[in-house]
Swiss-Prot record:
Induction: Induced by abscisic acid (ABA), salt stress and dehydration. It comes from the Eukaryota. Keywords: Coiled coil, Nucleus, Stress response. GO terms for biological process: cold acclimation; positive regulation of response to salt stress; positive regulation of response to water deprivation; response to freezing. The keyword Lipid metabolism does not apply. It comes from Oryza sativa subsp. japonica. Gene3D superfamilies: 6.10.140.1430. Residues 3-52 form a coiled coil. Residues 1-20, 116-258 are annotated as: Disordered. This is Late embryogenesis abundant protein 17.
Amino acid sequence: MASRQDRREARAEADARRAAEEIARARDERVMQAEVDARSAADEIARARADRGAATMGADTAHHAAGGGGILESVQEGAKSFVSAVGRTFGGARDTAAEKTSQTADATRDKLGEYKDYTADKARETNDSVARKTNETADASRDKLGEYKDYTADKTRETKDAVAQKASDASEATKNKLGEYKDALARKTRDAKDTTAQKATEFKDGVKATAQETRDATADTARKAKDATKDTTQTAADKARETAATHDDATDKGQGQGLLGALGNVTGAIKEKLTVSPAATQEHLGGGEERAVKERAAEKAASVYFEEKDRLTRERAAERVDKCVEKCVEGCPDATCAHRHGKM
């Protein structure tokens, strides 16, 4: 705003300077024209005076050179009269020219004085007008500047108030949103905790029930496996005894199937005990633990079978040797007799 006022004042000063220069140029032109007119009039006066002086000097010379008497004197008198007339004529012209020159000079001085007064008045009026315009412009600028300052201050206050109101509203909204968010978060946290606790309790109860069921099933499976193992072992022992008895009878009669047949019978018995046949197809008991139990039962049954077989074999061999010794003196003709091979 200050720069705008400065520009306006500078323009006003420039306009005032241009007006003063125009006035000075006009005054100089008029003064120069008056001076030219005065010089022309002076030149006319000087020429008229020179002409008149030359005529007077010619008349005096003619008067002194002429002699007296007669026609010559008459001529001289006529010439003198003519010169006098000319002199009077030129004197009137000179007076008229001098008067005209004086009048012209006076008129020129008057015009110049009037022009100077006019120029001074115009300059004063121009200066007064410029000063008045400058003052009015300065006053208007100050008023505008004051109004603009007041307007700017009002707008600034309004803007500050609006910004403060917006900030307060935003702060309140943020606080409300934050409170709502905190409440929602706390509610969600409580719900999550309750759900987690409930899920944990349910999971714990489920795990406990599952563990109990697993323990019960394991115990039941172990009992079943133990019973099955016991039955299998007993059955294997019975089969072993039956097989041994059958083998002995077959050996005595020469109709037995041998050790491989007996082993196959015992193996079939163990396999039959370790499988369940509710229908036409065999269904093995499931589960890794059950399978391991069945394998251990089969191994134990096989061990019992082989132990029982070895015991029975040793008993039967001892019985055969005793029978062989009782029947023959030099030795048993049977190729399996132990004492024929130096084993006695």
